[in-house]
From Swiss-Prot:
Function: Ketocytochalasin monooxygenase; part of the gene cluster that mediates the biosynthesis of a family of the mycotoxins cytochalasins E and K. The hybrid PKS-NRPS synthetase ccsA and the enoyl reductase ccsC are responsible for fusion of phenylalanine with an octaketide backbone and subsequent release of the stable tetramic acid precursor. The polyketide synthase module (PKS) of the PKS-NRPS ccsA is responsible for the synthesis of the octaketide backbone. The downstream nonribosomal peptide synthetase (NRPS) amidates the carboxyl end of the octaketide with a phenylalanine.
Pfam family, one: Pyr_redox_3
Gene (UniProt): ccsB
Site positions per UniProt: Transition state stabilizer: R421
Entry's family note: Belongs to the FAD-binding monooxygenase family.
Name of the featured protein: Ketocytochalasin monooxygenase
InterPro entries (alphabetical): FAD-binding_Monooxygenases (IPR050775), FAD/NAD-bd_sf (IPR036188)
Length: 636
């Protein structure tokens, strides 16, 4: 369209030149219009040099090993359930499907199975309640950072509309329990139960599953929905075991120590000095609550987060409920995912607030408004300029909010927007204006060590009564399955899950089916279609699992399924597409869990998400199921 228009304009200029003023002709024959982003005055080299300098100062030789899993010996108490689960008698039972995990992925799989007519299943989870991440993360201020209307599962089916755009933990768990009640899932669940081993028995084509209570389940299918944000990760700093004050991980908040609840009101901190190590997504939500209630708060920072504001207003629930057509939630999820991947959708999707500036949709709209046609070869430059602009705005916002210039400078993020998990909070930056709050920036080095009573950073001791580790979860993609789950998983050829994947990284079909582990259905990000809304991924994978299991049980012809080696290899190759570009970007970022603490080259390309996104993954898997011949599967 753009080239056709230019031909028309050039022809018109030649024809009408005698009767058009020279000033107008100069506009027609002058420089071509440029995208508004290309008019911005950025010193690209200086910005990228600053990014690299900030990255370099944070790099460590020990990489991910600088952190300690809470499963390791001395740190085990940091992962224990505050609910103090009780002992019970062992259970011996057979079932068609055993679901490992009662978080969103496990619950969605259970509901999808139920909807497909498969009701002989059991759910097992180490937590004392449902919700997975949202069971463990009950710290003050915990809230979702994806719009509630697409994040909370089964809103349409339960008839519930969230109270606000980004709802808080208690409301999320209320919806979880609403789902549990509607589909009678509690009756089929075993909570406060940790699976210790799973072994395939080829003689009966079933899994033997054992737990810490001495349970023994025999099951045909296993849905492995163990999740990612549940096993606390601690900084590997000397002295943790010797600290005499109170200390816990943010994912195991202990209100017996702080008082209050998830809204705050931590009255028992009124005369205490509190330290928090970490400034990631959880800390950003926590700090304003601690700032309000603690006598003194030290915030120990390695790398600042990018902070954005959001409208978190209340919904007009009755009118919103009336306006939503059938199928609205799944459609809204689809629109959200499509826009993020640059696809054209029929309507605007305000669920993208805070993310829309870097989408192709936004860049093309800005071009259209300026009368500019974007050529494919311009897209990388425009995306980078959009990122520069956004990060400049984020840093400018820090200057506007934080009164102390030295503190403001230390809170500014110097990296590309998606290098670290984006965070959103309207009160985090302002908390540093409180006289009782002190930022302890470690210039990328982290805390040095703990004494019996203090945190040592930058050569200075900071005495604290309570220390909170807001240092994330054991999300390292290279961490072995046993370390992350505590499950000794042994397949049909006598090899463990870790021995299989240690060869060359994940080998799967669709990210779900795994050779040597028959009837094991894996729910995880590797080789699966994902989007910024994890709930959407659980829906897509849940549909695939439920329809696959239901068809297998209805047909009854085969008892066990596992992908062929050729099918795994082909799917692995498809997942490696674009890995070079992903690696280059990750190598430009400061250390974090996105890039294996600054060593992304150690991550096999096969650990990547399916590169074409959740919508294409859904289409591929749906077509595979509709063919009905289990293509790429060994069957017996």
């Amino acid at each position: 369209m753009g080239s056709l228009l230019s031909i028309v304009l050039r022809s018109a200029t030649r024809i009408i030149r005698p009767i058009i003023p020279s000033s107008v002709l100069s506009l027609l024959s002058g420089p071509k219009p440029v995208h508004p982003l290309q008019t911005l005055q950025f010193d690209k080299e200086a910005i990228l040099e600053k990014y690299q300098a900030e990255r370099a100062k944070r790099l460590r030789q020990d990489g991910v090993s600088q952190f300690k899993s809470a499963r390791s010996g001395a740190y085990d108490r940091f992962r224990q359930d505050v609910a103090r689960p009780q002992s019970r008698e062992p259970i011996e039972a057979e079932t068609k499907v055993l679901i490992v995990g009662a978080g969103f992925a496990g619950l969605v799989a259970a509901v999808k199975l139920d909807q497909q007519g498969v009701q002989d299943f059991r759910i097992v989870d180490k937590a004392a309640g449902f919700g997975g991440t949202w069971y463990w993360n009950q710290y003050p201020g915990a809230a979702c950072d994806v719009e509630s209307l697409i994040y909370l599962p089964f809103l349409e089916e339960t008839g519930y509309i969230p109270s606000r755009r980004f709802c808080y933990g208690p409301e999320i768990r209320e919806q979880v329990n609403r789902v549990v009640a509607k589909w009678d899932l509690a009756r089929r669940s075993h909570l406060s139960t940790e699976i210790t081993s799973m072994t395939w028995d080829e003689s009966i084509l079933r899994w033997h599953v054992k737990t810490n209570h001495g349970d023994h389940f025999i099951t045909q299918f296993v849905v492995m929905a163990t999740g990612t944000f549940h096993e606390p990760k601690l900084p590997g700093i000397p002295g943790i075991e010797n600290f005499k004050g109170d200390h816990f991980h943010s994912g195991r908040w202990d209100y017996r120590i702080t008082g209050g609840d998830e809204t705050g009101n931590m009255s028992q901190l009124a005369n205490k000095t509190v330290g928090i190590i970490g400034t990631g997504a959880s800390a950003v939500q926590l700090v304003p609550k601690l700032a309000r209630d603690a006598k003194k708060l030290y915030v120990f920072q390695r790398t600042p987060s990018s902070i954005r504001f959001r409208d978190n207003s209340l919904y007009d629930t009755p009118s919103l409920k009336k306006s939503l057509p059938p199928g609205w939630q799944r459609q809204r999820m689809t629109d959200f995912a499509n826009i993020l991947t640059g696809q054209v959708v029929d309507q605007d999707c305000d669920a993208l607030e805070g993310l829309q500036e870097l989408t192709m949709r936004a860049i093309l709209k800005e071009a259209s408004d300026a009368g500019v046609t974007v050529q494919p070869e311009q897209i990388p430059e425009l995306m980078q300029l959009a990122d520069f602009r956004l990060m400049q705005q984020i840093r400018g916002q820090v200057d506007e909010i934080v009164k102390d210039q030295e503190t403001a400078a230390k809170l500014k993020p110097w990296y590309s927007f998606m290098c670290k998990r984006p965070t959103f909070h309207n009160d985090y930056l302002a908390a540093f204006n409180n006289p009782n709050v002190e930022l302890v920036d470690t210039d990328g080095q982290g805390v040095s060590y703990l004494t019996e009573t203090a945190v040592v950073a930058n050569g200075r001791e900071y005495e604290v009564d309570l220390l909170v580790y807001s240092t994330g979860f054991d999300f390292d993609v290279e961490a072995n399955f046993y370390r992350r789950t505590g499950i000794q998983l042994v397949g049909s050829r006598g090899r463990t899950f870790d021995e299989k994947w240690d060869e060359k990284g994940p080998s799967t079909l669709f990210g779900v089916h795994i050779r040597e582990f028959p009837n094991l259905l894996y729910v995880g990000p590797a080789q699966t279609g994902v989007t910024a809304n994890w709930t959407h991924t659980t829906y897509a994978v849940g549909d695939h699992i439920a329809e696959f299991v239901a068809k297998s049980l209805r047909d009854g012809q085969y008892q066990a399924f596992e992908p062929t080696e050729e099918a795994e290899e082909e799917w692995g190759r498809r997942n490696e597409e674009g890995s070079e570009m992903r690696l280059l970007f990750a190598q430009s970022c400061p250390p974090g869990y996105y890039n294996r603490e600054g060593k992304p080259e150690e991550i096999p390309a096969r650990w990547a998400y399916f590169p074409k996104g959740i919508i294409e993954w859904t289409r591929i898997t749906q077509e595979w199921r509709e063919k009905g011949d289990y293509q790429g599967m060994d069957k017996r």
